[in-house]
Amino acid sequence: MTKYNWDERHIITFPEKKLALETKDLHVYYGQKEAINGIDMQFEKNKITALIGPSGCGKSTFLRSLNRMNDTIDVAKVTGQILYEGVDVNASNINVYEMRKHIGMVFQRPNPFAKSIYKNITFAHECNGVKDKQTLDEIVETSLKQAGLWEQVKDDLHKSAFTLSGGQQQRLCIARAIAVKPQILLMDEPAASLDPVATMQLEETMFELKEDYSIIIVTHNMQQAARASDYTAFFYLGDLIEYDETKKIFQDAALQSTSDYVSGRFG
């Protein structure tokens, strides 16, 4: 078994680029166990960043901390800063529900509401008092077009979301997330339950979405990370080990551990 120097780091920063998000000394604890060990990380605006690493390395925990999904776990504690447009969204005075309108989440398994396709998109707006049908119609059409689903469902908008295939349901969940106009989309293994065709369609949707959104995706699929992302970050045991342009990570990684992981020789 190869021995690696886990004190080595290679982490890119973006001093001259527009940032979508930045973490400073971010720690996540579950009870007494530290799951994320003080991560400093910057995300460039309108790019796709992939988070990779072995199961249990902390990448999903880190992702969920970025819009405070870990708040729902009683024993979880998050310290450090999560900076969005200069505001620390980890601060105690932040309205979490308002913040999530700016930093949306798409989960591993499609989770459409038990409503029509149309109502899945308009639900949040209607809850906030939007009633004008023309406005809602425009939101539905725009969101479904951006998610690459409009042409497939435009004649079936009032059918149950559960009539859609798995891949279509996942794109509906993306449409639902972007309907409230977030700046950032967090995706936790969004293709894990999809077949190869649906996965490719999802990746094509991501390429189109990055024109308007910054995307951070957790994936176990190295081919997907290589194909679909601009930057890749390698996590191990709660630490950010290497972070660079995806091409460099997969073709000329700075660290042996990263090179071995992406090439399947890790261990």
Swiss-Prot record:
GO molecular function: ATP binding; ATP hydrolysis activity; ATPase-coupled phosphate ion transmembrane transporter activity
InterPro entries: AAA+_ATPase, ABC_transporter-like_ATP-bd, ABC_transporter-like_CS, P-loop_NTPase, PstB-like
Protein's GO biological process: phosphate ion transmembrane transport
Cellular compartments per GO CC: plasma membrane
Residues that coordinate or bind ATP: 53-60
UniProt keyword Cell membrane, yes or no: yes
PROSITE patterns: ABC_TRANSPORTER_1, ABC_TRANSPORTER_2, PSTB
Source taxon at top rank: Bacteria
EC number of the protein: 7.3.2.1
Pfam families assigned: ABC_tran (PF00005)
Location in or out of the cell: Cell membrane
CDD domains reported in the protein's UniProt record: ABC_PstB_phosphate_transporter (cd03260)
Family: Belongs to the ABC transporter superfamily. Phosphate importer (TC 3.A.1.7) family.
Subunit description: The complex is composed of two ATP-binding proteins (PstB), two transmembrane proteins (PstC and PstA) and a solute-binding protein (PstS).
Protein name: Phosphate import ATP-binding protein PstB 1
Organism for this UniProt entry: Streptococcus thermophilus (strain ATCC BAA-250 / LMG 18311)
